[in-house]
Curated annotation (Swiss-Prot):
It is an enzyme of class 3 (hydrolase). Belongs to the YqgF nuclease family. It holds the Pfam family RuvX. One of its GO terms (cellular component) is cytosol. Its EC number is 3.1.-.-. The keyword Hydrolase applies. It comes from the Bacteria. Transmembrane segments: none annotated. Keywords: Cytoplasm, Hydrolase, Nuclease, Ribosome biogenesis. InterPro entries: RNaseH-like_sf (IPR012337), YqgF (IPR005227), YqgF/RNaseH-like_dom (IPR006641), YqgF/RNaseH-like_dom_sf (IPR037027). This is Putative pre-16S rRNA nuclease.
C-alpha cells in the first residue's frame, strides 16, 4: 500500500453503543486518542463530530472495518461502511477504510484495557487504526466517489 499524504484526520472505531475517536496533527506525527462518543442518535453523533472536526481542522476521516479473518465483509463492517459514508457526506470530507480485524484485542493488550467498558478501549482502537493508516494508507477518497448508504440510522 502507498503511504498517504499526512493531513489532520479523525479516526473512528464505530460501535452501536460508542464511537472511539482519535486524531492526528496535520503532519501525521502525533496520534491522540480522544474522548469516545456515547451514542444516542445519528444527529447527536453528527453534532459532536462536526464540532470536533471544526475544532481540530479535520481534513479527512478514517473508519475501521471489522472484516473477518479472510478479509471479507461482516454485518458489522457493512454498518461501519454505511455510517462512515453518511458522516463523510454530511461533513463533505474524504474518507478511507482500515481493516480493524483483531484491533480491539491488540489495543486491549497494548494499553491494558481488556475489560474496559468506558470507551477508552474504543478510542485506543481508533488510535491504532489511525497509526496503521498513516503507515499504510489507502489515500482518502472524495465524497463524490462514495456509494450511498444502504442502511438507515
Amino acid at each position: 500500500m502507498v503511504r498517504p499524504k499526512p493531513t489532520s484526520v479523525l479516526s473512528f472505531d464505530y460501535g452501536h453503543k460508542r464511537i472511539g475517536l482519535a486524531g492526528c496533527d496535520p503532519l501525521g506525527i502525533t496520534v491522540t486518542a480522544l474522548s469516545p462518543i456515547h451514542r444516542i442518535s445519528f444527529q447527536k453523533d453528527l453534532t459532536l463530530i462536526k464540532s470536533l472536526c471544526i475544532e481540530r481542522e479535520i481534513k479527512g476521516l478514517i473508519v475501521g472495518l471489522p472484516l473477518d479473518e479472510s478479509g471479507q465483509n461482516t454485518v458489522q463492517s457493512i454498518h461501519c461502511q454505511n455510517y462512515g459514508i453518511k458522516i463523510a457526506k454530511e461533513l463533505d470530507l474524504p474518507l478511507a477504510w482500515v481493516n480493524e480485524h483483531s484491533s480491539s484485542w491488540d489495543a486491549g493488550q497494548k494499553y491494558n484495557l481488556q475489560n474496559d467498558r468506558t470507551g477508552k478501549l474504543d478510542s485506543a482502537v481508533a488510535a491504532l487504526l489511525l497509526e496503521q493508516w498513516l503507515r499504510e494508507g489507502p489515500e482518502l477518497q472524495p465524497v463524490s466517489k462514495l456509494d450511498s448508504p444502504r442502511i438507515k440510522f
